[in-house]
Amino acid sequence: MRIGHGYDVHKLVSGRKLILGGVDIPYERGLLGHSDADVLLHAISDAILGAIGEGDIGKHFPDTDPAYKGADSIKLLMHVMGLARDRGYAIGNVDATIVAQRPKLAAHIPLMGENIAKALETEASRINVKATTTEELGFCGRGEGIAAYAVALLQRRHELSPETREVLETR
């Protein structure tokens, strides 16, 4: 078993879409970044990369590379999962927290979980996403940005239950 932790933050600005967990969230501002700036998927990607000892997303998808301009972070997460899979790992579980004063995200969390589970080739029951505010404290509380934290537990594929291995083999 291996565990990794990830964190990401992006500034909220006008003229950008707000994408979290691969979901387009209706809001008057979006996150500024080289890619689609999906802080949730970036934090999860960093957690997985940390668990396999492969650095962070900046190493794999540098913001100086035009190939990643406007990149879909679901595709980046799928690439990261491929690196873990190539090393014999599967997702044990992912637990992630989005920190945002606004907008309210509860209604979007189920779809975020589904998107993440699909990208990570696992069951939705292994993915937990939650959202919290900072009670109007700090940059998130002032609505200047959104942050996300994630922890990923990876298991060797042979350590998974026979039922889970069967599900993964059909994907």
From Swiss-Prot:
GO terms for molecular function: 2-C-methyl-D-erythritol 2,4-cyclodiphosphate synthase activity; metal ion binding. InterPro entries: MECDP_synthase (IPR003526), MECDP_synthase_CS (IPR020555), MECDP_synthase_sf (IPR036571). A divalent metal cation binds at residues 8, 10, 42. 4-CDP-2-C-methyl-D-erythritol 2-phosphate binds at residues 8-10, 34-35, 56-58, 61-65, 132-135, 139, 142. Binds 1 divalent metal cation per subunit. Its cofactor is a divalent metal cation. Its EC number is 4.6.1.12. Keywords: Isoprene biosynthesis, Lyase, Metal-binding. The record marks 34, 133 as: Transition state stabilizer. It is an enzyme of class 4 (lyase). It catalyses: 4-CDP-2-C-methyl-D-erythritol 2-phosphate = 2-C-methyl-D-erythritol 2,4-cyclic diphosphate + CMP. Pathway: Isoprenoid biosynthesis; isopentenyl diphosphate biosynthesis via DXP pathway; isopentenyl diphosphate from 1-deoxy-D-xylulose 5-phosphate: step 4/6. One of its GO terms (biological process) is terpenoid biosynthetic process. Belongs to the IspF family. HAMAP family: IspF (MF_00107). NCBIfam families: ispF. Involved in the biosynthesis of isopentenyl diphosphate (IPP) and dimethylallyl diphosphate (DMAPP), two major building blocks of isoprenoid compounds. Catalyzes the conversion of 4-diphosphocytidyl-2-C-methyl-D-erythritol 2-phosphate (CDP-ME2P) to 2-C-methyl-D-erythritol 2,4-cyclodiphosphate (ME-CPP) with a corresponding release of cytidine 5-monophosphate (CMP). Homotrimer. This is 2-C-methyl-D-erythritol 2,4-cyclodiphosphate synthase. It comes from Geotalea daltonii (strain DSM 22248 / JCM 15807 / FRC-32) (Geobacter daltonii). The gene is ispF.
